[in-house]
Amino acid sequence: MAEDKRSLLQRFIIWREKNIKEKRFILILSFLVGIFTAFAALILKVIIHWIQNFLTDNFNATEANYLYLVYPVVGIFLTGLFVRYVVKDDISHGVTKILYAISRRQGRIKRHNTWSSIIASSITIGFGGSVGAEAPIVLTGSAIGSNLGTIFKMEHRTLMLLVGCGAAGAVAGIFKAPIAGLVFTLEVLMIDLTMSSLLPLLISAVTAATVSYIVTGTDAMFKFHLDQAFELERIPYVIMLGIFCGLVSLYFTRAMNSVEGVFGRLRTPYKKLIMGGAMLSILIFLFPPLYGEGYDTIELLLNGMSNAEWDTVMNNSFFYGHGNLLLIYLILIILFKVFASSATNGGGGCGGLFAPSLYLGCIAGFVFSHFSNEIEMTAYLPEKNFALMGMAGVMSGVMHAPLTGVFLIAELTGGYDLFLPLMIVSVSSYLTIIMFEPHSIYSMRLAKKGELLTHHKDKAILTLMKMENVVEKDFVTVHPEMDLGELVKAISASHRNVFPVTDKEGVLIGIVLLDDIRNIMFRQELYHRFTVGKLMTSAPARLYDTDSMEQVMRTFDDTKAWNLPVVDAENKYLGFVSKSKIFNSYREVLVHFSED
């Protein structure tokens, strides 16, 4: 039966190659990716809401609920069991994994990612994990695109495009935001915008959004009604809000990396579970709005609250009934949200940073405007408007994606009347954070390793190249105790003009250049007088097998060498890299990468 299925697929692939042009088939695949991704997003949302409603239906809104101490630990524990014994692979940092797949795995994402992130994030968020469902569904969508392309034997350049289609469809489907889905793919995943890539991305995003509209209706995700039109006199305050959001984004990014670094140093999953679960439980117990994605709090702030309604933000907390402490309460939430999100993922949970970014931005915008109004600055700042703008500001800063921030918030809320201030806030936030952090929270790990694909063509091509593909191993090795006569025999057996010198353990200790011994190599009376140890010189530099190609090229530029030896972490000789080999490989990647 399996053979029949395989042969049927093979027959279809052969038929497709004869009857359907490549570009047209890519459009068909992008349409399918949009449909599958939209349904994956809908399934994820339904499961999360069902779990949350089941667990919190009988909560008393007027007093602290001690179940907050239990639920997050249970969620992280169940997620950890699922990942460890069912998935048996790391599925955290979804967007970072997509970036890595594009730059180092030729767009190939493991098959289990088409479903594993849905289950893991549903458990984590449903039980109160303080993270978002969007990054897991983006990874799911990208995995759907990658594996669909793999099934039909598409080349890796097309796989990378289908990965982008999956991401665009995921954002469009879960947020009902097709433009934001397209822009996210271009800004965050850094898929190049060409005519051959634009149409598939659009088809996938529009298809996913349409499916969401059909199933859940055409209403925006958040209800927002503009009570006061934007006035130009508020532009200085909008710029200040953008700078404030940039600083909040910087705090969130650096604190997140620091806390996750602490969890990374814990070697056993049980220590991570205990530390993460305890931290998250205590934080949610003290600040219940940290429970789950936080969209209920966003809804409250965007709807606008009277003084009498402020207590609703503090439901189930010890602050309930003290509306005069709202500002302090929200500032504490801004400070502790990053610890709640880090504890969720670091402890073994699965979730993304879309929702935390939106959540922090909404609260930051509200706090900024509410504080300004309290001290009676010259212009009144509509708090719900600034809460909306804050969402765009923090998202733009955390993701280093100002256009995504603008279009996503506009489509999420229908707040198109605030398009100008949304742009101002997003740009101000982005310009603020890049002064301190050149890479987004998703890309900084890959950028440090030289594994990040960017819109910079030269760096992008170097990123797509791999060290193992340019290392040449047909060099004859010699040893320091060999005499000149033995060296001449080695030279006669080689077509190279450089000879690595290694000890008995294979450690590189030097090189012999043919040009350096040319004047004595034919004088037989000197064959027993000189040894390789006396004739060898140090290599201009050493390359390591873990070096990125950008580091390799920088070393060649610094040394002006034509050949450089490659060693491992223990300095054992592996081979040589030559400029000619690099240039040939560079040219091959350039031609393939630039085809349109």
Q: Where do the language-model regions lie?
A:
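ATP/adenylate-binding site constellation spanning eukaryotic-like Ser/Thr protein kinases
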Residues: 204, 425, 472, 514, ...
